[in-house]
């Protein structure tokens, strides 16, 4: 993990996400791909959400979980999450008590409804 990533790890630092978004008139682009903030053992690049493009229910971000790392159990209460797995594989444990499990591989697309408890293990 780079020094920058260590500095961002789980800081909860508030970042102005608008500065990474270009666009107007209904089409928006995020062009910054470096990690800019950390939360729950996940490193995030700029993404698209209500905070910067006005999406009411959907959040999509570039996120990195270090090899062998875990994003501890959590719930997204007010928004949906869409994930495209670029490389590697992860195990999602989800549902009440996180008792269900599914393995995702590079190339998989994942959709998580609001209110679903889930924990992610980078395998």
Predicted regions and their residues:
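Asparagine-centered strand-capping/turn motif at beta-strand->loop junctions
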Residues: 121-123
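Short proline/glycine- and basic residue-enriched helix-capping loop/turn segments at helix->loop/beta transitions
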Residues: 64
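A short beta-strand-loop-beta hairpin characteristic of the jelly-roll/cupin
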Residues: 70, 79-106, 116
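A short, N-terminal "cap"/entry segment at the start of jelly-roll beta-barrel domains
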Residues: 1-57, 72-73
